[in-house]
């Protein structure tokens, strides 16, 4: 067959996979910053398909052997450093993706990858929902001493939008960050910080309802992810 080269193999492959990466990256970004039930449903419907695609690419022996041929070619050392590094990293990704596994380990590896993707998405959803669930209503503007005028106005408008008096603070970045950076009251900064770092955990402060709070607890997800990663590492010989 024809000798494999950067121009005939790597560039066409990257052009094809880049299209999926870009499109899915946009969808993933939107699911993180503009989450809606509809978008979440579509994302979760397609996540297993995208995960399966990348897992199958990572276990594609023919692609792996093409990269290996590039690496073993006499002119490899003459390639530009960036191209050499790209080839080396591709080979590493293939090995970590289970390309050298045989059945049934190969199928188990794919199942682990898909389960990890689903758990990772659920983890993110729980953090988003826990972030949405928290609010702190401050009645006395003196407690917000140090906050810039625009942050104060936004907090006031946020409270009014809910039909409430005073100022509403949340764990969303436009509300949370000005408090952490500018608020003079240590107690206010601490209360918001504790709420932020314990989101979706067994020590979470929101939602107020214990059942709803427990439903967003990521502890069990973390435990399962750690176990899956340990099994994945074992399958790869680590």
Task: Please report, for each region that a protein language model flagged, where it lies by residue.
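Zn2+-dependent metallopeptidase catalytic domains
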Residues: 1-238
């Amino acid at each position: 067959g024809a000798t494999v080269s950067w121009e005939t193999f790597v560039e066409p492959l990257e052009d094809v996979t880049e299209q999926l990466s870009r499109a899915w990256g946009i969808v993933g970004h939107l699911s993180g910053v503009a989450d809606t039930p509809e978008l979440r449903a579509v994302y979760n419907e397609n996540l297993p398909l995208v995960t399966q695609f990348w897992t199958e690419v990572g276990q594609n022996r023919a692609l792996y052997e093409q990269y290996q041929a590039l690496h073993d070619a006499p002119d490899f050392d003459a390639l530009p450093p960036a191209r050499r590094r790209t080839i080396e990293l591709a080979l590493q990704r293939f090995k970590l993706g289970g390309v050298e596994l045989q059945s049934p380990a190969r199928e188990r590896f794919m199942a682990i990858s898909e389960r990890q993707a689903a758990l990772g998405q659920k983890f993110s959803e729980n953090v988003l929902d826990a972030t949405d669930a928290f609010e702190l209503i401050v009645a006395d503007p003196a407690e917000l001493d140090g906050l810039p005028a625009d942050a104060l106005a936004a907090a006031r408008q946020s409270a009014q939008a809910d039909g409430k008096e005073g100022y509403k603070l949340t764990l969303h970045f436009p509300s949370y960050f000005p408090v952490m950076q500018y608020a003079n009251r240590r107690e206010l900064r601490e209360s918001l910080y504790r709420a932020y770092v314990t989101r979706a955990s067994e020590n979470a402060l929101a939602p107020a309802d214990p059942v709803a709070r427990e439903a967003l607890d990521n502890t069990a997800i973390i435990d399962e992810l750690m176990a899956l990663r340990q099994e994945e590492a074992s399958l790869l010989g680590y």
